[in-house]
Amino acid sequence: YPSIINILPSVNKFGGAGKNFYRLIKDVDLENYDYICFSDQDDIWYKDKIKNAIDCLVFNNANCYSSNVIAYYPSGQKNLVDKAQSQTQFDYFFEAAGPGCTYVIKKETLIEFKKFIINNKNAAQDICLHDWFLYSFARTRNYSWYIDRKPTMLYRQHENNQVGANISFKAKYKRLGLVRNKWYQKEVTKIANALADDSFVNNQLGKGYIGNLILALSFWKLRRKKADKIYILLMLILNIF
């Protein structure tokens, strides 16, 4: 369908989903579309996924949309991945708005993000997770974001998932490793620095254990899920973050 499908020329391998999506956002002409959806090749969308997302955007007068998903495994196991807890003051520094493959963004918002990553090429390319970065960009620029409790797709889990659903013990152990080796802290810091956000969180980053303790005083503002609020509190107090 050459009239509706535009295939971009092949370029060098980028080595991760983030840089691939940054390339797509920069190279695709967004002006002819009202909404832009991110997609992974190995997930299964529900038939009403896009309609449901646009209906939610219109009804809630929001700029950006994401949703819960159903993680599914080669064994046939399925689990709800719930990311639709209430947004907090600073959650965007510490997590995405759900899997990026559920994102549906109004054209005007993504065009602004496109301008940002073009004008801040080095900083943007250094941030691993495009979906987390886009959520942070939107929140710091006061674009409204709606996270839907309704699952809109099957989110396939396999060994090559860059992040994954974080449900199994193995997945949680892998995430803990990313915290302990400071990958997580570095990504938070890179996002805060790239966005030049002069917030409470950014002002504590890089201040060592004292900064962690100050962040711990506002731990309930840093994540959405109750359990994750406790996890980050412990990470800060124990100086694992």
PLM regions and their residue ranges:
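C-terminal subregions of glycosyltransferases and related glycan-biosynthesis enzymes
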Residues: 116-123, 154-241
